[in-house]
Amino acid sequence: ELLATRVWVGVSAGSMVTGPDLLLRTSQIVYGEDLNRSEEMQALGLVDFYVLPHLNSQFFEKVRKEYIDEAVKVTDKTLYALDDQSAIAVLDGKREVVSEGVWHVWNEK
């Protein structure tokens, strides 16, 4: 209800929790964190796609297109990888990437 009259700004993991679930298998591969879990965890479900932030960041060596190309094979949902100069605006169900940097999309529908 609130999203109809408010703006959600998700930064870093705050953008990841907006999707249908946390896409743990992919996240564990590209972020290199072993969360000691294999089952999915529900996210907020505000959008029907996934976001992987920090594309090409010096702090996350596997958040690169070549790693994500492999890791994304576990889902058929749309996934965006965004660098720190990129964002996704969603208005009336329409997505628009706003970027002065680099971003990629997989399984675009």
Model-derived regions: residue spans:
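Catalytic nucleophile loop
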Residues: L2-D21
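C-terminal and late-domain segments of enzyme folds
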Residues: L22-K109
